[in-house]
Amino acid sequence: PAFRMRFWNLGANGQVLVGCLASAACMFYLGGKVPDGVVNIIMIVSAIAAGILWAVIPALFKAFFGTNETLFTLMMNYIAEGLVGFFVSLWATDGSGVLRPMSDGRLPMIVSQYFAVVFVAVLITGAVSVYLRFSKHGYEIDVVGESINTAKYIGINVKKVVIRTLALSGAICGVVGLLLTGGINFTVNSELHGGMGFTAIMTVWLAKFNPIMIIATCFFVSFITKGMAQVRLDFGFTDEATANI
């Protein structure tokens, strides 16, 4: 949604990380003390709230002070990494600086470990597609993206649209963090996002900001990435050679 509004949000990595951190905090402090179902509910709310907070901060500065969102959101990534590093060192009981996978408070596994992740991703993609195409908010996002002056002229509250849209983007990133920590890795570290925020920029541009087409471009990028990894193993290519291919 943010890119469709021409708000260049480069902070998805940080927004995902704070979602991971919020989920890990719930698992660490509440896991084993309260029922897992209650922990899961608190995790969901906390991860989404953390993602929203991390996205709304630059949105507020953009809306009220005209701050460059590209630089601001990029810097927020490094702050998120620092926060994660601090809490991991605090929680690591063995002095290794590594938080080992936690067994309590995990999200329930449906069919397989990755099925729920894929299901949620498809569900969010469909919901966002409907939201952008058929809702008043989606129309306002398109108008603001095309021309801020036109949006103001027809009575759209641009500041409100910017903040609301970034809150939605942050919420989605928070859900991603929730799934990474609560459903797949059961821990957190500063590299857990795997650079997916920057990969998402490429897939979104390839899809021309169309949520449904993003599914196809994500598969395309995944095929290339995994295929090149297999080529490297089969033919002994270097990492640099496969990256260039």
Predicted regions mapped to residue ranges:
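Helix-loop-helix "hairpin" substructures at the membrane interface of multi-pass membrane proteins
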Residues: 110-187, 211-212
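Transmembrane helix-bundle core of multi-pass membrane transporters
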Residues: 69-134, 187, 239-242
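Alpha-helical transmembrane segments of multi-pass membrane proteins, especially transporters
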Residues: 12-20, 39, 43-51, 69-77, ...
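Transmembrane alpha-helical segments in multi-pass inner-membrane proteins
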Residues: 167-173, 179-245
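Alpha-helical transmembrane segments in inner-membrane proteins
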Residues: 1, 34, 51, 58-59, ...
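Generic alpha-helical transmembrane segments of integral inner-membrane proteins
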Residues: 21, 41, 45, 49-57, ...
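Single transmembrane alpha-helix segments in multi-pass membrane proteins
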Residues: 1-30, 44, 48, 52-67, ...
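Aromatic-anchored segments of alpha-helical transmembrane domains
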Residues: 23-26, 78-84, 174, 221-231
